[in-house]
């Protein structure tokens, strides 16, 4: 394949990609770092993205681009640049006989970190299939989610979500040139990326831009997916050295001149103990925008938006891992005293519930009885805490999404649960939490969908390899056909059915070390307990 044959003409100008061989021996082509927006620098910092200017000379897109600014916890340093609103395209070939369906992936990271780079999201496994895989960078932290209240400042927030919206539109306008079908786009995301997918499903700004969605371990029903405004702009500016003159507009002017590294270094230090008790996960994340604009993503409470969501008409595959809550042990390892805090259970009753303190205390007692009936929490006895965090932080939000779909949608909802527990291949648990722990942590499933910096491929006779091929097969089948039933489910003698809309208990495809099974969700009774905390129509 010549270099000329790897040159593609986009709406904005020609780009050159390269030919690769995957870790599994599959030839594929890649285009990395294609601009989909102008660099959000100077006066464009914090604002909604602007489409790129056109170019005439062929742009070299054979190398990975820098990520958006963030603190990389794996590398323990601030990385990135501002000129990073770039998109990546991977496929077996760019001239297929018929256009291929597209999987457009949004990375997670709590809206504060993350990258589309191949060190975490390599295409080696998914390019086995007849799909086009697309990933992209979007702004995170304060640079992506700073919100000013005055319309005059022109920074209503959610710039990171608006980056995503522009990237989706770029795909519709350009993916045909790469062999993709703009009429068969599946929007997929993990964690904060999954919540982002749901924001686009409930926002009219993204209406009808894609045909299916995959939601992995994240939901707009989870409290961490929405930030409340508490004068964060001025607090951030003061932390960096602003003199306090000019109010919020003065703070914005100061922050536009500040070094991005200083913004990243100070943004997460703003949260107080009270903020965290009030369930504020980050100062800078998705927020209800203070006024309407043409690009507005969240005009009102997401809970209300979801009730008339355009996305209820399209199919969804949704799920998570069996021990999502292992993620929260990172904080407990640093602050083990939290497990013995007298308000451990009371503090995990959702603070936004409109109930009396007496009722809160009653629910706290139920949490204690359910997760620690005959013992007390400790680092040595952390399984109850892991289960409580799995349910509260991740699975209950997913459950509320599933219930809302059952009540309001006629489209299909497929639910999966991943419990692949490997001693060496659950990379997130091993490298970021604790290699001595067992279970399938939040983000562990990503190693079975995407290649990463470890360059590991399990042996073909292992359950890890079978799990990898199962996830790739199920996900790509949904992208291609809208039906996740595939060779790996058939091999296991399983039919992966959509959830019935009349049954309160949902079923899921359970992907485990010993194979696949279609079962009642194993921990449904725990989720029912969380459901009971909500009254009337507050659940969904």
Curated annotation (Swiss-Prot):
Enzyme class: hydrolase
Source organism, top-level taxon: Eukaryota
Protein name: Esterase B1
Glycosylation sites: 452
Gene designation: B1
Enzyme nomenclature, EC number: 3.1.1.1
Known function: Overproduction of nonspecific esterases is a common mechanism of resistance to organophosphate insecticides.
Source organism of this protein record: Culex pipiens (House mosquito)
Known catalytic reactions: a carboxylic ester + H2O = an alcohol + a carboxylate + H(+)
Family matches, as PROSITE patterns: CARBOXYLESTERASE_B_1
Location of the active site: 191, 324, 442
Gene Ontology molecular functions: carboxylesterase activity
Name of one Pfam family that matches: COesterase
